[in-house]
Regions:
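Residue-level preference for short coil/turn positions at secondary-structure junctions
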Residues: 1-2, 82, 126, 158
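Helix-rich "cap/lid" substructures immediately adjacent to catalytic or cofactor-binding pockets
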Residues: 2-87, 164
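Alpha/beta catalytic cores of group-transfer enzymes, especially the acyltransferase/condensing modules
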Residues: 11-13, 40, 100-195
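Generic anion/oxyanion-binding catalytic loop in active/binding sites
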Residues: 18, 58, 97, 130, ...
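A short small-residue
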Residues: 48-55, 95-96, 185-189
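Positions that flank functional sites
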Residues: 52, 91, 193-194
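Gly/Ser-rich oxyanion-binding loop with an adjacent helix/lid
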Residues: 62-132
């Protein structure tokens, strides 16, 4: 068998219902959700499983994603699927630290909860934004947004997918300019943050 890599998502991957099936069918996942909820004094089960708008607010999103990712990872590990390597995008780096046994999930949940609160304080909801630009070279994206204030390239995810970040209105304008320049898609991400603000 080849090597196994676990790659963990950053903010923007959240959705209501994430982790629910694992919670309902795995004692391991249930324990992770319950202990993390207690540690951060937040009902992560309600946050992740019930319809709400808080799931998209940074101060809640980050700990919810971390807890869900760790719960799924631990279920996989219990079933014999263990990572040889782990990596994460932004917030996902904390999950990778847990996967590498460099940080326990309770400490990670506490750290990420504080991180989310501080980030939310720095960039209130609706002020910042990010957009994934697909099918356009980085040099073309950089040209398309060059004259727009308060927007910049934030992530070079992979060839063909680059994320721009900044003031929400500027990001929206940048996404449109990228489409005009030939981008296959430009998708506003479900985040209220931006690199330019942090």
């Amino acid at each position: 068998m080849g090597k196994i890599a676990f790659v963990f998502p950053g903010q923007g991957a959240q959705k209501v219902g994430m982790g629910k099936e694992f919670y309902e069918t795995s004692p391991i996942a249930k324990e992770i959700f319950d202990k993390a909820s207690e540690a951060v004094e937040l009902d992560l089960k309600a946050l992740c499983f019930e319809e709400n708008d808080d799931i998209n607010i940074t101060e809640y999103t980050q700990v919810a994603l971390l807890t869900t990712s760790v719960a799924i990872m631990e279920v996989l590990k219990d079933r014999g699927i263990k990572p040889d390597v782990a990596a994460g995008l932004s917030l996902g780096e904390y999950c990778a630290l847990v996967a590498a046994n460099s940080m326990n999930y309770i400490d990670a949940a506490k750290a990420v909860r504080k991180r989310g609160i501080y980030m939310q304080e720095e960039v209130p909801a609706g002020v910042g934004g990010m957009a994934a630009i697909m099918g356009l070279e980085s040099t073309e994206i950089e040209k398309a947004i060059a004259d727009i204030p308060q927007v910049q390239v934030a992530n070079y995810n992979c060839p063909g997918q680059i994320v721009i970040s900044g003031k929400k209105e500027s990001v929206e304008q940048g996404a449109e300019k990228c489409k005009e320049a030939g981008a296959r898609r430009a998708v506003m991400l479900n985040v209220s943050l931006s690199l330019i603000h942090i």
